C-alpha cells in the first residue's frame, strides 16, 4: 500500500510502502503443522488448473513469513515459469531449510526463506511430461513431498514412466519404477506409515487407488521390494466399490489408515496385511439404535477431500461439498458437523485440514 499526493497535476508517492504482516497471496492447496509452524503451499494440482504463482509461506507465533520468489528465469530458458505450489516440507534436521513441489515446474529449494535453486528436467532426474515441446521445462510435474525416517525426500512425478523419485539425504537421486503406477495421471500424496510401509494416493482414471510399497528400508536394493496397487474396494461385508477418485490418506494414533474417496470413507485396520490375497477394507458401522438391529456405514457416499488426526485420535474429515466432520476416536460418534449454515467456515468445500 502506497500513499500519493497530487502535485502539479500528477500523483507523487508521499509515503509507503505499508506492508501488513499477512499471507503473500490468498492461495493454498495443502497446509500442515511442523511443530508450532503452519506450512502453506499455495497452488493447485489438477488437469486444466489455473496458473497460480508459486506461493510458499508459513505462520508461526502470530506472524507470516513469505518465501522469496525466483527473481529471474535460469539463463537460456524462455518464459520459464514457477506455478502452483502443491506441497511444502521442512527439513527435519534444519528448520530453516525447505522444499516446495510445483505442479508443472519441478522442485524448489529454500534456505532461511530465500530462494536457492530450482530442480527441473535439465539438472535433476525429474522428467518433463512433454519432453519434445519447446517449453518442455514448464511441464515437470512434482508433488507429494514427504521425508522418510532416514531423511530421504520422496516426491511424485505424475504422467511419467517412473512416478516415484527420491532425493537421498546425501543429495544423490533415486528413481523407483513400478509397472502398476507407470504413467499414472495424478499421484498426489504419500503416507510414510509407522510400520515402514510407503503408501501413496493415485487419484484418478485407470490407475487410481492406493499403492503400497514395502522397500524393506533398502532403497538401493530393489530385489526385496513388495508393491501393489489396489483400485477396487471390498469391505468386511463383501460389498464392492469402484471409486472414480481417491483423494486422501491418513494414519491415526493406532496405526490404522483412513482413506477418503468420492464414494466415502474406508479403513485399513492393519496396513501390513495390504499385500495379502484375503485383504479387505473396512467401513465403520454406526448402529441406528432404533430397535431394528441395523447399522449404517460412516459417511457412506460422502466425497472425502482430506483427513487429519488430532491428539485425542479423533478424525477431522473435510468433504467436497458437505462441510467438515469431527468423528470420535473409534468412529462411533459424530461429534460435530460444521457447514456454512452453522459455523464460520466460508465454504462447504474443505480442501485441506491441519
Residue ranges with predicted function:
Residues 3-5, 58, 109-110, 166, ...:
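Conserved blade-register residue in beta-propeller folds
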Residues 52-62, 164-171, 210-217:
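Beta-propeller blade signature
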Residues 1-2, 45-49, 104-108, 160-162, ...:
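Short glycine/acidic-enriched loop and turn motifs that connect beta-strands
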Residues 5-6, 42, 51, 59, ...:
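Structural signature of WD-repeat beta-propellers
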Residues 33-36, 90-95, 147-150, 192-195, ...:
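Residue-level detector of Asp-centered blade-edge/turn motifs that repeat once per structural unit
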Residues 10-24, 63-83, 115-138, 174-183, ...:
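Surface-exposed loop and turn segments in beta-propeller and other repeat-based domains
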Residues 23-30, 78-89, 103-104, 131-146, ...:
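Signature of short aromatic-glycine-proline-rich micro-motifs recurring in repeat-based ectodomains
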Amino acid at each position: 500500500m502506497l500513499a500519493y499526493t497530487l502535485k502539479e497535476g500528477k500523483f507523487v508517492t508521499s509515503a509507503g510502502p505499508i506492508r501488513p504482516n499477512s499471507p503473500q497471496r490468498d492461495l493454498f492447496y495443502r497446509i500442515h503443522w511442523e511443530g508450532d509452524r503452519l506450512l502453506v503451499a499455495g497452488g493447485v494440482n489438477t488437469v486444466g488448473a489455473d496458473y497460480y504463482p508459486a506461493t510458499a509461506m508459513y505462520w508461526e507465533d502470530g506472524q507470516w513469513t513469505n518465501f522469496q520468489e525466483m527473481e529471474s528465469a535460469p539463463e537460456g530458458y524462455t518464459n520459464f515459469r514457477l506455478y502452483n505450489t502443491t506441497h511444502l516440507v521442512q527439513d527435519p534436521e534444519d528448520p530453516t531449510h525447505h522444499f516446495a513441489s510445483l505442479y508443472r515446474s519441478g522442485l524448489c529449494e529454500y534456505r532461511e526463506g530465500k530462494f536457492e535453486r530450482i530442480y527441473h528436467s535439465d539438472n535433476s532426474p525429474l522428467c518433463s511430461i512433454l519432453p519434445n515441446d519447446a517449453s518442455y521445462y514448464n511441464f515437470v510435474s512434482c508433488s507429494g513431498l514427504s521425508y522418510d525416517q532416514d531423511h530421504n525426500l520422496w516426491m511424485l512425478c505424475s504422467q511419467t514412466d517412473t512416478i516415484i523419485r527420491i532425493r537421498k539425504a546425501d543429495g544423490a537421486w533415486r528413481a523407483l519404477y513400478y509397472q502398476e503406477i507407470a504413467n499414472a495421471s495424478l499421484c498426489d500424496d504419500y503416507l510414510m506409515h509407522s510400520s515402514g510401509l510407503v503408501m501413496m494416493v493415485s487419484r484418478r482414471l485407470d490407475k487410481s487407488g492406493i499403492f503400497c510399497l514395502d522397500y524393506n528400508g533398502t532403497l538401493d536394493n530393489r530385489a526385496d521390494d513388495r508393491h501393489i496397487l489396489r483400485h477396487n474396494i471390498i469391505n468386511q461385508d463383501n460389498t464392492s466399490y469402484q471409486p472414480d477418485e481417491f483423494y486422501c490418506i491418513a494414519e491415526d494414533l493406532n496405526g490404522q489408515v483412513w482413506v477418503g474417496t468420492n464414494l466415502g470413507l474406508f479403513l485399513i485396520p492393519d496396513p501390513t496385511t495390504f499385500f495379502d490375497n484375503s485383504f479387505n477394507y473396512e467401513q465403520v458401522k454406526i448402529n441406528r439404535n432404533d430397535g431394528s438391529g441395523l447399522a449404517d456405514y460412516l459417511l457412506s457416499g460422502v466425497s472425502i477431500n482430506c483427513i487429519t488426526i488430532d491428539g485425542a485420535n479423533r478424525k477431522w474429515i473435510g468433504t467436497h461439498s458437505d462441510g467438515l466432520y469431527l468423528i470420535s476416536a473409534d468412529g462411533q460418534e459424530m461429534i460435530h458437523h460444521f457447514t456454512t449454515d452453522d459455523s464460520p467456515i466460508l465454504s462447504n468445500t474443505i480442501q485441506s485440514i491441519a
